[in-house]
Amino acid sequence: MSAQKAPKWYPSEDVAALKKTRKAARPQKLRASLVPGTVLILLAGRFRGKRVVYLKHLEDNTLLISGPFKVNGVPLRRVNARYVIATSTKVSVEGVNVEKFNVEYFAKEKLTKKEKKEANLFPEQQNKEIKAERVEDQKVVDKALIAEIKKTPLLKQYLSASFSLKNGDKPHMLKF
């Protein structure tokens, strides 16, 4: 005979109690070389090989960068820090206001279920319309960045030139 009385009701299948997770969201530690104003080389994506200016670290652990668009065609966008090489070239970004740029600014608009169904029924290839607000923001940032870039001779040409490796180049021996 058992020392304790069996319960009147018990589940038909034993359900294991979930263990409490000890994981916590911690902010990402950026490399010491990633400081706002640093010129970066993009390694992947549509703009690979382009030199861009790093503006700000965003909450979702991405970097806010800009070409500037007028110089090399790279718009304001987010980039994962893994896909950049920091160079020793710096640009002053004191005159650039980047307060309004956050994760929500770059978030895609969510479609309702009805809109999704309609889009699936009649698929049409159309170019995405860029909001006028985005274009204005790009112009404001470009104006401030280009003013700083003009202060350094040949920096505009440096940013507009693409980076690539030639035969015999040893990337681990290069000093960026």
Curated annotation (Swiss-Prot):
Pfam families according to UniProt: Ribosomal_L6e
Alphabetical list of SUPFAM superfamilies matching this protein: Translation proteins SH3-like domain (SSF50104)
Cross-link (Glycyl lysine isopeptide (Lys-Gly) (interchain with G-Cter in ubiquitin)), chain numbering: 128
Modification sites for N-acetylserine: 2
Principal localisation: cytoplasm
Record CDD domains: KOW_RPL6 (cd13156)
Compartments, as annotated in UniProt: Cytoplasm
GO cellular component, one term: cytosolic large ribosomal subunit
InterPro entries, alphabetized: 60S_ribosomal_eL6, Rib_uL2_dom2, Ribosomal_eL6_CS, Ribosomal_eL6_KOW, Translation_prot_SH3-like_sf
GO biological process, one term: ribosomal large subunit assembly
Residues bearing PTM Phosphoserine: 12
Gene Ontology MF terms: RNA binding; structural constituent of ribosome
Keywords: Acetylation, Cytoplasm, Isopeptide bond, Phosphoprotein, Ribonucleoprotein, Ribosomal protein, Ubl conjugation
Post-translational modification: N-terminally acetylated by acetyltransferase NatA.
Role noted for this protein: Component of the ribosome, a large ribonucleoprotein complex responsible for the synthesis of proteins in the cell. The small ribosomal subunit (SSU) binds messenger RNAs (mRNAs) and translates the encoded message by selecting cognate aminoacyl-transfer RNA (tRNA) molecules. The large subunit (LSU) contains the ribosomal catalytic site termed the peptidyl transferase center (PTC), which catalyzes the formation of peptide bonds, thereby polymerizing the amino acids delivered by tRNAs into a polypeptide chain.
Quaternary assembly: Component of the large ribosomal subunit (LSU). Mature yeast ribosomes consist of a small (40S) and a large (60S) subunit. The 40S small subunit contains 1 molecule of ribosomal RNA (18S rRNA) and 33 different proteins (encoded by 57 genes). The large 60S subunit contains 3 rRNA molecules (25S, 5.8S and 5S rRNA) and 46 different proteins (encoded by 81 genes).
Family: Belongs to the eukaryotic ribosomal protein eL6 family.
Further remarks about this protein from its record: Present with 37100 molecules/cell in log phase SD medium.
Name listed for the protein in its UniProt record: Large ribosomal subunit protein eL6A
Species this protein is from: Saccharomyces cerevisiae (strain ATCC 204508 / S288c)
Gene: RPL6A
